[in-house]
Amino acid sequence: MKKLLIATSLVLLSATAWAQKSPTGNAGFDGLDKNRDGYLSKEELAGDKEMAKRFAKFDGNKDGRWTLDDYIKAHKNNDARIAADSTITTKVKTMFLTEKGIPSTSISVQTYEGTVQLTGTVESKDQVAKAGKIAAGVSGVKKVDNKLAAK
């Protein structure tokens, strides 16, 4: 009985240790904060391309390091970019599906920061041009990188 009580106590204590929160309560921030100073430097962000790209823009007080608040704002900005790019990609694909003469299943569409990239192989140069024109006409598209090839 005594052994069972000790074993149960150890399990409960270890579960409590596992339940400890990270220093800021944000696992993403804390995982990047290698030196555990409560800030993120540009070097600490180097492994996260999207966050590193946003470093200068979201360094609120321009001290060369991010607070948790800076990190959260940059993350929200990146999440909004992803949502906007996904919406554009969906709209372009939908336009291709509804347009006669466009082999939609032969065209890959990717969007990054409003730039749409078209890849794949279609039957003719006319289809290449038409697909590019359709993509360019979609709301939110800033640029079309048309890499479609004609057979």
Name the predicted role of every residue range.
Residues 2-12, 16-151:
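N-terminal targeting leaders
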